């Protein structure tokens, strides 16, 4: 079965709509935080954007009616966006059970840290894994090639390159935080890397390892066996 043409399928439309809604949701959350900051209201450290956190925001009363109006308007917008994203997630998950995606989704679900929703976004973005002749080319496409600065005979890695597919890069980083909790080999690698660099830099290296696992299962059509790759 050919994977050509999948990028123009319904999943791609849903994915792009979801990315747009997620960006709007992020802006809306930042606007709500700005309003709270403006009125000197301290935001709790834990539970950001949980149902309890949103109920807490709803209970707040500002000194001015205009502040109450602005906060309520942004909260209503946030709820609306969350509902749209939830509907899009359901639509994408429904597609994952179709013939066009079922086999690849089952393969990718064997990789720690990769959810079904992530599977679908990856498959839509990558389309056909065979178009990437090496891990380096795939990592470059995903924005996971470290920038290198040289000083004499010493080279310094400065982290992720800010090019190529920003959404895919973000997705892989997010999935890597989950993967290090589920895959003993990745957890060991992450802990070792964290001894000589910041955790936010270490997770970049883990994301590349995770991408290698993804490439392996799709290219070889074999489920991932933990601690093998």
Over which residues does each language-model region extend?
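Single conserved hydrophobic/aromatic residue that forms the stacking wall/gate
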Residues: 1-14
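A detector of single, family-specific signature residues
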Residues: 11-229
